[in-house]
């Protein structure tokens, strides 16, 4: 794990720490970007061969055990005995519920819109996160930084619409109902709220990050275990697991733990840049591994994201 002191911020620290921070962000971009291509690789007859709920539960449980091991290794167990209370731990239940709600909402809303419409409109979560970041955390963005957020939204929309050569491959008509539009707006709001709330909780409590993760993932395991048991899953817990699936699990475990570092020591806006950059990695890996054809317009979102990074951080 990349160690960053609780009293240091990446922007105002030594060159060595900035280099570690950059490495962490690049690693996150790679993990995020490789997730969808890896899922495609493990599909059989266009279907995911394993239980999605068991996979999520396994990921949450792994993050919980790693957080506990990290807490033991840091020698902060005595702090844990002092810090355990409902007042301290209960705020971490909110992100678990919000993320679980959104995971189910994504599946539910597919009946009210086509996948392409969802992919395009889900980029509005960038705007919702930025708005909640300024209103709930009291942070102020300059005009050029707001413009950078607009560039990220534009990059996501243009990438979804124009980067892939889908001629002759579109199987469903483009449509969205008024109910579907409302649901996708709720999805974007909840996504932003979960990110901003998590950042606020992590930064407001002066506790070791491993301890905060322990609280966070305990609730994550409880919520996802309840979801798995109530879902009537027909497949065995590890049925359909291949080497690629285990790579996905390991990647998502690392992704969650590293993203908590970003939320603790960076900002939710940094998370948005990671996710936006990851869609470009996703496209390149899909082209290289899956043979997906890219159009010349792929360079347009690349330029927009690069411009957004320059405007926001300079």
Curated annotation (Swiss-Prot):
Subcellular location: Golgi apparatus membrane
Catalytic activity of the protein: CDP-L-ribitol(in) + CDP(out) = CDP-L-ribitol(out) + CDP(in)
GO CC field: Golgi apparatus; Golgi membrane
GO MF terms held by the record: pyrimidine nucleotide-sugar transmembrane transporter activity; transmembrane transporter activity
Protein origin, superkingdom: Eukaryota
Residues exposed to the Cytoplasmic side: 1-20, 76-88, 167-175, 228-242, 291-314
GO biological process: transmembrane transport
Keywords carried by this UniProt record: Golgi apparatus, Membrane, Sugar transport, Transmembrane, Transmembrane helix, Transport
Membrane topology: Multi-pass membrane protein
InterPro entries xref list: Nuc_sug_transpt
UniProt KW S-adenosyl-L-methionine keyword: no
Positions of transmembrane segments: 21-41, 55-75, 89-109, 146-166, 176-196, 207-227, 243-263, 268-290
Primary localization class, coarse: Golgi
Family label: Belongs to the nucleotide-sugar transporter family. SLC35A subfamily.
Main function: Mediates the transport of CDP-ribitol. Does not exhibit CMP-sialic acid, UDP-galactose and UDP-N-acetylglucosamine transport activity.
Protein name (record): Probable UDP-sugar transporter protein SLC35A4
Native source organism of the sequence: Danio rerio
Lineage start: Eukaryota, Metazoa, Chordata, Craniata, Vertebrata
């Amino acid at each position: 794990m990349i160690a960053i002191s609780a009293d240091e911020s990446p922007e105002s620290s030594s060159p060595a720490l900035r280099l570690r921070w950059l490495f962490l962000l690049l690693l996150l971009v790679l993990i995020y970007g490789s997730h969808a291509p890896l899922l495609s690789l493990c599909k059989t007859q266009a279907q995911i061969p394993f239980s999605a709920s068991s996979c999520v539960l396994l990921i949450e449980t792994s993050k919980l055990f790693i957080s506990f091991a990290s807490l033991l290794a840091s020698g902060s167990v005595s702090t844990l005995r002092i810090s355990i209370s409902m007042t301290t731990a209960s705020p971490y239940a909110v992100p678990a519920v919000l993320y679980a709600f959104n995971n189910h909402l994504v599946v539910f809303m597919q009946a009210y819109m086509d996948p392409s419409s969802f992919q395009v409109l889900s980029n509005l979560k960038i705007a919702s996160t930025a708005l909640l970041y300024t209103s709930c955390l009291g942070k102020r963005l300059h005009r050029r930084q707001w413009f950078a957020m607009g560039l990220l939204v534009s990059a996501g929309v243009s990438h979804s619409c124009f980067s892939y050569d889908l001629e002759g491959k579109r199987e469903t008509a483009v449509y969205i109902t008024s109910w579907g539009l409302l649901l996708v707006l709720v999805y974007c709001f909840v996504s932003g709220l979960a990110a901003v709330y998590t950042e606020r909780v992590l930064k407001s409590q002066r506790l070791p990050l491993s301890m905060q993760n322990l609280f966070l993932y305990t609730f994550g395991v409880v919520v996802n275990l309840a979801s798995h048991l109530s879902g009537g899953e027909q497949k065995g817990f590890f049925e359909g697991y291949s080497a690629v699936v285990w790579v996905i699990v390991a990647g998502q475990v690392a992704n969650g733990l590293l993203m908590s570092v970003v939320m603790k020591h960076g900002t939710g806006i940094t998370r948005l840049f990671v996710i936006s950059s990851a869609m470009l990695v996703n496209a390149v890996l899909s082209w290289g591994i899956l043979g997906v054809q890219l159009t010349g317009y792929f360079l347009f979102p690349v330029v927009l994201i690069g411009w957004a990074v320059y405007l926001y951080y300079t």
